[in-house]
Amino acid sequence: MKKRASVRKICDKCRLIRRGGRILVICSNPRHKQGQG
């Protein structure tokens, strides 16, 4: 999980979701997991 100031989709399978006020990117590729903060 990478923590970034700006999260964005890297590939077509990346999904932006909001969980508990935080923005996360979940993907089938574990390298694409990102969290904001």
Curated annotation (Swiss-Prot):
Sorted UniProt keywords: Plastid, Ribonucleoprotein, Ribosomal protein
Native source organism of the sequence: Cuscuta gronovii
Pfam family, one: Ribosomal_L36
Family in the record: Belongs to the bacterial ribosomal protein bL36 family.
Lineage, opening ranks: Eukaryota, Viridiplantae, Streptophyta, Embryophyta, Tracheophyta
One BP annotation, GO: translation
GO molecular function: structural constituent of ribosome
Coiled-coil region(s): none
Protein name (database record): Large ribosomal subunit protein bL36c
Keyword Signal: no
Subcellular locations according to the entry: Plastid
GO cellular component, one term: plastid
PANTHER family: 50S RIBOSOMAL PROTEIN L36, CHLOROPLASTIC (PTHR42888), LARGE RIBOSOMAL SUBUNIT PROTEIN BL36C (PTHR42888:SF1)
Entry keyword annotation includes Ribosomal protein: yes
